[in-house]
Amino acid sequence: MAKDMDTIVSLAKHRGFVFPGSDIYGGLSNTWDYGPLGVELKNNVKKAWWQKFITQSPFNIGIDAAILMNPKVWEASGHLNNFNDPMIDNKDSKIRYRADKLIEDYMQDVKGDENFIADGLSFEQMKKIIDDEGIVCPVSKTANWTEIRQFNLMFKTFQGVTEDSTNEIFLRPETAQGIFVNYKNVQRSMRKKLPFGIGQIGKSFRNEITPGNFIFRTREFEQMELEFFCKPGEEIEWQNYWKTFASDWLTSLNMSSENMRLRDHDEDELSHYSNATTDIEYKFPFGWGELWGIASRTDFDLRKHAEHSGEDFRYHDPETNEKYIPYCIEPSLGADRVTLAFLCDAYDEEGVEGSKDARTVLHFHPALAPYKAAILPLSKKLSGEAIKIFEQLSSKFSIDFDESQSIGKRYRRQDEIGTPYCVTFDFDSLEDNQVTVRDRDSMEQVRMPISELEAFLTEKTKF
């Protein structure tokens, strides 16, 4: 079925996945709050990433670096001078756009070219396309544009009691630099030999010119990043390894491979620090969008921090007796983006035999579902006994307890929030200590001893 973004956003708000930020005060543009189900879903996504990329990896370990860092970090990394987007303003609407995204949206929506990439084009090349194609502002419908200029994406603030340049600091625009500046601390304290990786999950902030598409592009967002260090010359081999590993992680959590593609960056599109980058893209209802960037950052970051800090980041190879600055592969994934992708991928509307109404269902992998099961007493008279099952299971799983309305309406409600199993406690349960377990996807029902529920859910939530 063709999926509509407005319908998915409406469901997310209605069912408590995501709410507009500061809603009672009219909101704040491009801010979103995760509701009770959204925070469970996103936490499960982060848990699944950490499990496979850190806990179960023989190579990788984790850290949690500070959001606020010495400004010299951003000077060394190049963010102060190079972390910019091409900005263009429409003189009539007074609205500001990212020039590259304005062109890409036009090429996709008007020309039908989903593969056109403007990133990497010069200002002159982008302005020529805008002028030659007669691209207009979506609001004013005019082509009365300013010249394209650079716009730095970093949020600036001040530390201390006075707001002057000596106290100027920045909210981090990426989590990666917190890993690079801790490279020696981690490598020495954990006695790691190459190859090895350092991963973390954390908030980052970018003053995006044109954020949008719900939680896909926001100014405050969460990243799940791994910096994997290896011997120079082995970086492409490891980049291919992490491309496959990342793709397999997505499909192991039931993301449809038909909605995924790998796209290699052209040479003129590569970031200044990269000699190879591949994006894993997902086909959202609004078009293809980047989920995961897997970049070979060479030795750029460690070398720059060595130059600016005076620290020696060379690795002494015990096998060859060489000294060299390691190369780095960075698989960088947006937690909000991939949560949105799992939400879009799971959404479905299905016809039900014997009913004229379609059911809305979220086909989440059980490991990601906000609730692993819902306990449903057939009658409120049975709630006292049914709640005991909730208490038994909720120490290990996220479980819902729902006793209101008919059992059919409760099934539909649980389908709509992606609960994989409904456990119905009926009057027979009082006698035989068994319950009816309904599968969300097949709608099939089986009778099961209460004593087997924990083992059943443990097995089903593996991935």
Swiss-Prot record:
Key words of the record: Aminoacyl-tRNA synthetase, ATP-binding, Cytoplasm, Ligase, Nucleotide-binding, Protein biosynthesis
GO molecular function, one term: glycine-tRNA ligase activity
One BP annotation, GO: glycyl-tRNA aminoacylation
Alphabetized InterPro entries for the sequence: aa-tRNA-synt_IIb (IPR002314), aa-tRNA-synth_II (IPR006195), aa-tRNA-synth_II/BPL/LPL (IPR045864), Anticodon-bd (IPR004154), Anticodon-bd_dom_sf (IPR036621), Gly-tRNA_synthase/POLG2 (IPR027031), Gly_tRNA_ligase_bac (IPR022961), GlyRS-like_core (IPR033731)
Disulfide bridge map: none
Binding locations of substrate: R98, E174, F221, E222, Q223, M224, E225, E330, P331, S332, L333, G334
Enzyme Commission code(s) on record: 6.1.1.14
Main location: cytoplasm
Subunit text: Homodimer.
PANTHER family in UniProt: DNA POLYMERASE SUBUNIT GAMMA-2, MITOCHONDRIAL (PTHR10745:SF8), GLYCYL-TRNA SYNTHETASE/DNA POLYMERASE SUBUNIT GAMMA-2 (PTHR10745)
Listed name of the protein: Glycine--tRNA ligase
Organism: Staphylococcus aureus (strain bovine RF122 / ET3-1)
Gene behind the chain: glyQS
